[in-house]
Amino acid sequence: WDGRAKTLADQAAGPPLNPIEMASSSFDEIIAKLNADRKFAKAFTTVYPDGLTQANITDAIEHFERTLITPDSRFDKWLRGDDSAITSEELEGYELFKKYDCATCHAGKNLGGLSYELMGLRRHYFADRGLELTVEDNGRFKETQQERDRHRFKVPGLRNIEHTWPYYHDGTRETLDAAVRDMALYQSGVELTDEEVHKIEAFLLTLTGEYKGQLLTNSNSRDMIDGH
């Protein structure tokens, strides 16, 4: 969200040491645990002759993460000319998505991830949220110390968005319906009707892709990746 990791390998080094994720105290601790599995350590050296190091571990994770692509969503198929890939209601949702300027920030191959934008462009999100501000709420400012970057966050990509809840950097929205309503209000200054929310949400569901030829669902996504 704040752009602190400059490369995918840098990102891979974060969760192992995060106290609320994997909670290791250091990479020395991680390396010692991995070396205790002699079979794994031996297999690792067939790819990385100098063995288990922080650089090699994060490089390996980076290479795995690069395989986690999910092409061939219904929207992809529609863009390639298959008019039957999405319904008229979903297409209306796409038109609303563009009408209310969602596509201005959620652009590119992943419908996001290209820029840092203010959270609460048209209305003060943090005041309305009613929670005490945290360091994480500073967003990009944490890294740049530039006042213009306070509350500015990387725009998330929208592929597979139905499976990536809870939403926002603070995880305060658990449904896509609520996230769509809020983003229209806080970023575009628009109060959507229930029908408009439903149609935009229908469009967003067309962005769910396939992994190894299987459509991602809440029930199968972990199994498919674990079996990679």
Model segments located where?
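Periplasmic c-type cytochrome electron-transfer domains
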Residues: 1-228
